[in-house]
Amino acid sequence: MSNSHYNNYQQQQPHSSNGDPEYQHQQMVHQPQRFSNGHGMKTVAVPDMCLFCFEVLDCELNNVDGPSVPVFSNDAYPLFVTWKIGRDKRLRGCIGTFSAMELHHGLREYALTSAFKDSRFAPISRDELPRLTVSVSILQNFEEAQGHLDWQLGVHGIRIEFLTERGCKRTATYLPQVATEQGWDQLQTIDSLLRKGGYRAAITPETRKSIKLTRYRSQEIQMHYKEYREYQERRAQFGKVQC
C-alpha cells in the first residue's frame, strides 16, 4: 500500500453544521460481492445500487437529466458511497452519513457528494469515469462496545468519540474493510482513527481507554465502470434488464 493511500485515510474529515462529521472514508453485475461482515443480516445492498450511483454521476458529468426512480428498496439506512480509481483502486472520494436516509435519495445525494466534495481530492472529472469503481456500504447493527478493543477486524466498522488535547469533542470512523485493506491490527487502527479525527498529542494506553467506541456492520457492494457500461449496452439493445 502506497504512503499516499495510507495518508488519505488519515486526513481530517469536514464537519456538518451540528458538529457531527460527515465521514469521508469491482464487482461484476451478475455476481455481487458482499463482505463477510454483512453475514447474518437482511440483504439490502444489491448491484442496482451501484448502477444507480454510476448513472447519477454519469448524468451529472455529461449535463443530462438524472436517472429515473430506481427499483431497489427505498428503506432508510445509514450509508456510504466510495469511489476508487485505477487498477490499484486508489481512494478517490468517500463520504457518507450515520443518519438513516431513504436509499433512493441518500444514494443519489452521496454519489455526487463523495465524487465532488471530498475535501481530500479534486472533484472527479469526466475523463476519469472509465477508470472508476463504486462501492455502496449499507450500515446496520450498531452496538456500543465495552472497550476500545471490543470489535473484530474485518467484521466491524468502528466509530469513536474522544476529547482532543484541548478538550474538544471529536468523532471519526472507519468502515469495516479499511483496517484489513491497510494491514493494520486493532491498535494501529485505533491510533490512525484518533489522528484522522484530529488528535495531535502523544497517544497513550490511557488515551485509547478513554474513547467511546461504537461498532457496526456493513454490507458492501462494488462495481467497475466496465460492468456499468455493459449493463447500459444490454439495456439499449433489449430494454430494461435485471442484474
From Swiss-Prot:
- The organism encoding this protein is Drosophila melanogaster
According to the record, the residues making up region (Disordered) are 1-30
Entries under Gene3D superfamilies matching the protein: Hypothetical protein ph0010, domain 1
Instruction: Write out the biased-composition intervals (Low complexity).
Output: 1-18
Where would I find the AMMECR1 domain in this sequence? 38-232
Looking up InterPro entries in the UniProt record yields: AMMECR1, AMMECR1_dom_sf, AMMECR1_domain, AMMECR1_N
Mind telling me what this protein is named? Answer: Uncharacterized protein CG5902
